[in-house]
Amino acid sequence: MIEDIKGYKPHTEEKIGKVNAIKDAEVRLGLIFDALYDEFWEALDNCEDCEFAKNYAESLDQLTIAKTKLKEASMWACRAVFQPEEKY
């Protein structure tokens, strides 16, 4: 058993392993998003066609949203495993 953290139910090695797996998956997917973002940004920078530029700009916005949602999804999954005790 791991030393307790205030506001959370007791942690176990199993719970820590699950949360580490969640965080590893988050990092891997985040790196894919970053690579796509760089690819689309470069394409936008070199684009002379306004319609294609609009599409690349939209893709950049979508990837920004995806990255934000990825962080949120990871946070909720970690909370599900660690089960915080809300006392307010």
UniProtKB/Swiss-Prot annotation:
Outcome after substituting Y8A: No longer inhibits host CapV phospholipase, 5-fold decrease in cGAMP-binding
Keywords: Nucleotide-binding
Disruption phenotype: Decreases the titer of this phage in E.coli about 50-fold.
Effect of A73D: No longer inhibits host CapV phospholipase, no longer binds cGAMP, does not hexamerize
Record text on subunit structure and interactions: Homohexamer when bound to 3',3'-cGAMP.
Organism: Enterobacteria phage T4 (Bacteriophage T4)
Effect of S74N: Partially inhibits host CapV phospholipase
Molecular-function GO term, any one: nucleotide binding
Cystine pairings recorded for this chain: none
Protein name: Anti-CBASS protein 2
Entries under InterPro entries matching the protein: Acb2/Tad1_hairpin
Function, in words: Antagonizes CBASS (cyclic oligonucleotide-based antiphage signaling system). Binds and sequesters host-produced 3',3'-cyclic GMP-AMP (cGAMP) with a dissociation constant of about 30 nM; each homohexamer binds 3 cGAMP molecules with 1 cGAMP molecule binding to 2 monomers. Sequestration of cGAMP inhibits the cGAMP-activated phospholipase activity of host CBASS effector protein CapV.
A Pfam short name: Acb2_Tad1_hairpin
